[in-house]
Amino acid sequence: MEIKRMKRKFECTRENPLHSQLSNLNCSLIQEITVKGFLCDEDYELLTKMSGETGNLRILNLYEVCETDCQCENSYGKPEQRKIEVADNAFEDSIRLEKIILPAKLEAIGSPTFGGCTNLEGVDFPESLNSIGSEAFLDCPKLGEVYISKNLSLGEVYSHAFSASADSFVCDWDRWPVNKDGEPTYTGDRFGYFSYNGVLFFGFVWDECIELEKYPSMNDRSTYQIPYGTQIIKYGAFSNCKFLHKLIFPETCGVITEGSICGCPELETLVFRRQGLDGERVHHMDLYWGDVITNCPKLKDIYLYAENPENIAFGVFEKLDNMSEIVLHVPCFCAKKYRDYEEEYCSMYDYNDKKYVKVWRKFKSIEEFDPVDFLEDGI
């Protein structure tokens, strides 16, 4: 026999908020709620509890919410008041929540809102949304396809917002911005966020720079070849990618931001086709960058097309936990150059106190390969 969900509808105001109307009800029995009007922090706290481990709330309809009284932090960590937003920490670890309909005029989603909602399925984002907080949908494996609105500008989809979650990204612009002849396929003076084969990118028209923002962590591809024309890999781009075994970087990609590749449990092979490679800081106020590739326990092979080790920043690989188990592959006649290359290290207390380390020898071995044959094999 099918059991009917216990449903409730509420019309809320500042004078009569949701948490007051729910105070005389047995909230643990309610499985579906529709809210119209006003929501505040106390309301979000109660809804989070109702959809958590001790609750039973499965479906939440906030479509007609037209005003909120809460604040989400901006990219500088400071509270920013908007007319309609989902509060910071709301619905974190709401493991009972299966479906949510967001407010029609929603402007911002806080951090780490919805993080750990392991049963939450597809969420439709309204066109009005212009900010998605850090780790907003962290570890939501059933999230599926995510639509990113054209209204979201650079920096407003914050770090790890969809880590270990989405299996595909779709934008209004869903094709590569340059054709085979190098001619632009877009119109206007900028194209911002765009998607290509389910991956999220950002493009700057004024300097023709293309950044890979986020690879969908739950996509079941085992091999991904980053499109030619991509120049920069952003922070958290390949975080918690559950199924990725091989990742190939094109000749155009020479900058990898710290924290770009982390927590990929099945990643075995990395291929870098560019003759030069460098890291990048997340915050320009930082003096140095680091931790570019971390926590990839099955990584066994790294292929570098660069013939000169001086053009490759060793720091990109420096934080590999299992470097002594990884084979470094370099072009023919280049192994000796890599083995003998020395990097200078200076004491932080005395600049004249220097030492020279043959850094590439930290790998398990350095072996040669022919890039021409490799390219013919599609790698």
What is the predicted function of each stretch?
Residues I261-C262, W289, I293-T294, I312-E318:
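Predominantly extracellular/luminal carbohydrate-interaction, adhesion, and secreted-enzyme modules
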Residues R8-D93, V205, K234-N240, C262, ...:
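Surface-exposed repetitive/solenoidal architectures
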Residues R5-T13, Q31-L39, G55-I84, I95-A108, ...:
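Structural signature of tandem-repeat unit edges
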Residues N24, M50-S51, G77, F91, ...:
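A general structural signal for stabilizing positions within well-ordered secondary structure
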Residues D88-A90, G110-T113, G133-A136, Y158-A161, ...:
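Consensus positions within tandem repeat domains that build extended binding/scaffold surfaces
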